Amino acid sequence: MPTMQRVAITGSTGLIGNALVGHLKSEGYTVQRLVRRPSRSAEEITWDPQAGTVDLEALAGVDAIIHLAGAGVGDKRWTKKYKSEILNSRLLGTTTIANAVNAVKPSVFISASAIGWYGETGNRAVIESDRAGEDFLAAVCREWEGAADLVKDVRTVKIRTGLVLDPTGGALGRMLPLFRFGLGGKLGSGKQWWSWITLHDQIRAIVFALESKIEGPMNLTSPNPVTNQEFTAGLARALHRPALFPAPAIALKIALGGFSTEILGSKKVLPQALMDAGFVFDYPHIAPALAALVD
């Protein structure tokens, strides 16, 4: 049985949250989902990030709180209104949860962040100690992590997540239909670095953070980032299809607006904190990872 018996999670219906809930339950944890409506069972706890409230009585006695909730950065076009939603959903939600953590004092608080923290890195590899970038998502991440830093006297881990790979969602889920029909190719120049991690290793790394002594920022990426050209060529090989249809940068900018900077931008991020703590990836290299994911 796990040493931490009871875990509360926000964002439990997302790609990562849903997989994490299933894994934790299979490992013997009691999992409670934070929901934005009246709770329907003991497995649910009501919270309202807009109002800044959490049912603290229901949350009392929890061993760990994992905060994953936030508006998806790739879900909608980056209008001024949606950019505000991206920021505010993280700032209000994390501030609310941080205050709840300070009230109930679990053993550990794990708060989502992203490798967007680093901004554009070009060909330069970055680790957790590197400073934040200057673009929109870097600014979001600074405020997001700043809200998590409101927590005092509780071990806190800020998980800077990279490109999470799973065939059921995220970037890979969107790319697969085109690549299965042989219509895929590199995006833009293809020279931009993609710092990726399988959903499988993402979940393992979060559980590692839960059960170990690690704290502070933690990059959740493979130790072997690849260029977009390497990624798309590898995906085509895994599917036994050609990759003959590149998407020009201008087309992506027209189709995706501001979010295109995340597709075309370069982030070469290494998981130094995880490696220093002894975490071992099941899928450290892209070729076997993609082969397993599309099998």
What positions do the PLM features span?
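Conserved Rossmann-fold NAD(P)-dependent oxidoreductase catalytic core, especially the SDR/UDP-sugar
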Residues: 95-135
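Mid/C-terminal beta-alpha module of Rossmann-like enzyme folds, strongest
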Residues: 211-258, 291
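Alpha-helical substrate-binding/gating segment
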Residues: 176-184, 192-226
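C-terminal amphipathic/interface module of NAD(P)-dependent oxidoreductases
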Residues: 1, 261-295
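NAD(P)H-binding glycine-rich loop region in Rossmannoid oxidoreductase-like domains
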Residues: 39, 43-93
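Glycine-rich "substrate-gating" loop/helix at the edge of Rossmann-like oxidoreductase active sites
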Residues: 132-135, 162-169, 189-197
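Conserved beta-loop-beta element that borders a ligand/cofactor-binding pocket
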Residues: 113, 146-167
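N-terminal Rossmann NAD(P)H-binding glycine-rich loop of SDR-like oxidoreductase domains
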Residues: 6-27
